[in-house]
From Swiss-Prot:
Annotated organism of origin: Streptomyces sp. (strain KO-3988)
UniProt activity-regulation remark: Does not require any metal cations for activity.
Family: Belongs to the aromatic prenyltransferase family.
InterPro entries per UniProt: Aro_prenylTrfase, Prenyltransferase_CloQ, PrenylTrfase-like_sf
Keyword RNA-binding among UniProt keywords: no
Pfam families with a match to the protein in the record: PTase_Orf2
Subunit and partners: Monomer.
Identification of the protein by name: Furaquinocin biosynthesis prenyltransferase
Enzyme Commission designation: 2.5.1.124, 2.5.1.125
GO molecular function: prenyltransferase activity; transferase activity, transferring alkyl or aryl (other than methyl) groups
Protein purpose: Involved in the biosynthesis of furaquinocin. Catalyzes the transfer of a geranyl group to 2-methoxy-3-methyl-flaviolin to yield 6-prenyl-2-methoxy-3-methyl-flaviolin and 7-O-geranyl-2-methoxy-3-methyl-flaviolin in a 10:1 ratio. Can also use other substrates such as flaviolin or 1,3-dihydroxy naphthalene, and can also use DMAPP as prenyl donor.
Top-level lineage group: Bacteria
Chemical reaction(s) catalysed: 2-O,3-dimethylflaviolin + (2E)-geranyl diphosphate = 6-linalyl-2-O,3-dimethylflaviolin + diphosphate; 2-O,3-dimethylflaviolin + (2E)-geranyl diphosphate + H(+) = 7-O-geranyl-2-O,3-dimethylflaviolin + diphosphate
């Protein structure tokens, strides 16, 4: 079936799939932006998980994201720099990946590109079951100070030794920290308390129900403030529209008409911004591989905590 190992993964085929999928959302892929990224990583596409992602908030309006995995022996940021996919920077965001590599074992990387914005993110997946700790990560000089500044918060909710994935956004200069969170973190009172603790508006009733089904969460931080920007929750589902209609008509059209990964599970993420806006991200798969850390990194049964 489309979306599994039987799809074509050469650059031309992947680009064609991106172009068609983005078109379902009335987004036109910029070939001059997308093609150089795909060709830079052409050698790894054969074994990669490839996913498409769309968000409902205004900031992501008109863009469409593509994510694919990269084996641990390939440094995705180094490739991006060598191919001029992104400019070298003296900002700490440019040093974070190499600092993590020197400190931590890495299983897999992920790359995100926008069909308008190009190469923008790298994801670092730690080996399955080998969670990193904030005690180690906060010692990195390139790490945002907001991570260390919120250690008490993360410790309070049992997250300080449960870091599973780090996401580095080079364009927005933000960082995501994914946690293999204890099941209590998805309960209504805890969700409410976590939002209140960091000064975010209370989630809606619909989002509380969404969180009850979550498999994991991540927080977004930056280098400019000591605040946690937002907490996002993820749900794994074969039919995202059964959860809510807030994905919007365009995303609903995408879900119903995308020809790839029809029978594979989707990921839906939800978050509340500081302004009180609730928005959602849908991740659908062009090529699904269940053995990949992209799918297994933070999908371990949420009620099972590592000893």
């Amino acid at each position: 079936m489309p979306g599994t190992d039987d799809v074509a993964v050469d650059v031309a085929s992947v680009y064609s799939a991106i172009e068609k999928s983005a078109g379902l959302l009335d987004v036109t892929a910029a070939r001059e932006v997308v093609w150089p990224v795909l060709t830079a990583f052409e050698d790894v596409l054969e074994q990669a998980v490839i996913a498409f992602r769309v968000a409902t908030n205004a900031r992501h309006e008109g863009d469409f994201d593509v994510r694919f995995t990269v084996p641990e022996e390939v440094d995705p940021y180094a490739v991006a720099l060598s191919r001029s996919l992104i400019a070298k920077t003296d900002h700490p965001v440019g040093s974070l990946l190499s600092d993590i590599q020197q400190l931590c074992s890495v299983d897999t990387y992920g790359v995100d590109l926008g069909v308008k914005s190009g190469f923008k993110k790298v994801w670092v997946y730690f080996p399955a079951g080998e969670h990193e700790t904030l005690a180690r990560l906060t010692g990195l000089t390139s790490m945002p100070g907001s991570l260390a500044g919120n250690v008490d918060f993360f410790t309070r909710y049992g997250l300080a030794d449960k870091v599973d994935v780090i996401g580095i956004d080079y364009r927005s200069r933000t960082m995501n920290v994914y946690f293999a969170a204890p099941s209590e973190c998805f309960e209504r009172e805890t969700v409410l308390a976590m939002h209140r603790d960091i000064g975010l508006p209370s989630p809606s009733e619909q989002m509380f129900k969404f969180c009850e089904n979550s498999f994991g969460l991540y927080t977004t931080l930056n280098w400019d403030t000591m605040e946690i920007e937002r907490i996002s929750y993820g749900v794994k589902t074969e039919n995202p529209m059964t959860f809510f209609a807030r994905l919007g008509t365009k995303v609903e059209h995408f879900v119903k008409n995308v020809p790839y990964g029809v029978d594979t599970q989707k990921m839906v993420y939800a978050a509340v911004t500081s302004s009180g806006e609730e928005y959602y991200k849908l991740q659908s798969y062009y090529r699904w591989r269940s053995v990949s850390r992209l799918n297994a990194a933070y999908i371990a049964a949420r009620d099972k905590e590592s000893t």
